[in-house]
From Swiss-Prot:
The active site is at 111 (nucleophile), 131 (proton acceptor). This is Carnitinyl-CoA dehydratase. SUPFAM superfamilies: ClpP/crotonase. GO terms for biological process: carnitine catabolic process; fatty acid beta-oxidation. It catalyses: (R)-carnitinyl-CoA = crotonobetainyl-CoA + H2O; 3-hydroxybutanoyl-CoA = (2E)-butenoyl-CoA + H2O. The keyword Lyase applies. The keyword 4Fe-4S does not apply. It comes from Escherichia coli (strain K12). One of its GO terms (molecular function) is crotonyl-CoA hydratase activity. InterPro entries: Carnitinyl_CoA_dehydratase (IPR022852), ClpP/crotonase-like_dom_sf (IPR029045), Enoyl-CoA_hyd/isom_CS (IPR018376), Enoyl-CoA_hydra/iso (IPR001753), Enoyl-CoA_hydra_C (IPR014748).
């Protein structure tokens, strides 16, 4: 793996640390490498949860590497599998990803965090989409995902003026799950990851599949859809060994042993 990415496996948890000088900014080469990491995570049956963070205490990621842009890298360059930062366009990832935001998450860095399932951030974290000030748009998910969380007036201000949002405000709006001290950030992210590992993997996959496919449907239509048999994970989880193991472990007052089948 490149010098820009540090990977650590802790049992079934994969930790990815983005480590690039000048604000952990991401060029096309690094984005390709991140895409390979996330696709390998998706396909590795031994891995259950991923944590993505940035090196240092100032920047999670400043997004697209503007130095690379100044040297000719185009905004519509091929950023590799998974889109920008390797995660923003993986739409079929049925394992959870936690963004441990250790500082500024600007532009594509914020979009990377928004592509995760959970955001745990340090109290010094700050979020912004300043692309309009650079003559471009946050088209790696920012302008698409943020309106699903925030009211239109707040979205407009963030994407059109580049307004920054601090950690506590992001928590109030429901953008982030937790705000902790810098010193507690990774321990907190690992604690959340372990809680996810304690849940059945097929159930997690089914939940993500249901969210992904029914989020824009009326509730009644969504009910019919998930029971129609077209989904991959939901029908299988109902008849899985894990669906037997969970109640059995509860009755026997022990921790369940998940098999993922």
């Amino acid at each position: 793996m490149s010098e820009s990415l540090h990977l650590t496996r802790n049992g079934s948890i994969l930790e990815i640390t983005l480590d690039r000088p000048k604000a952990n900014a991401i060029d096309a080469k690094t984005s390709f490498e991140m895409g390979e990491v996330f696709l390998n995570f998706r396909d590795d049956p031994q891995l259950r949860v991923a944590i993505i963070t940035g090196a240092g205490e100032k920047f999670f990621s400043a997004g697209w590497d503007l130095k690379a842009a100044a040297e000719g890298e185009a905004p519509d360059a091929d950023f590799g599998p998974g889109g920008f930062a390797g995660l923003t366009e993986i739409f079929n990832l049925d394992k959870p990803v936690i963004a441990a935001v250790n500082g500024y998450a600007f532009g594509g860095g914020f979009e990377l965090a928004l592509a995760a399932d959970f955001i745990v951030c340090a109290d010094n974290a700050s979020f912004a989409l300043p692309e309009a000030k650079l003559g471009i748009v946050p088209d790696s998910g920012g302008v698409l995902r943020l309106p699903k969380i925030l009211p239109p007036a707040i979205v407009n201000e963030m994407v059109m003026t580049g307004r920054r949002m601090g950690a506590e405000e992001a928590l109030r709006w429901g953008i982030v799950n937790r705000v902790v001290s810098q010193a507690e950030l990774m321990d907190n992210a690992r604690e959340l990851a372990q809680q996810l590992v304690n849940s059945a993997p097929l159930a997690i996959a089914a939940l993500k599949e249901i969210y992904r496919t029914t989020s824009e449907m009326p509730v009644e239509e969504a009910y019919r859809y998930i029971r129609s048999g077209v989904l991959k994970h939901y029908p299988s989880v109902l008849h899985s060994e894990d669906a037997i193991e969970g109640p059995l472990a509860f009755a026997e007052k022990r921790d369940p042993v998940w098999k993922g089948r």
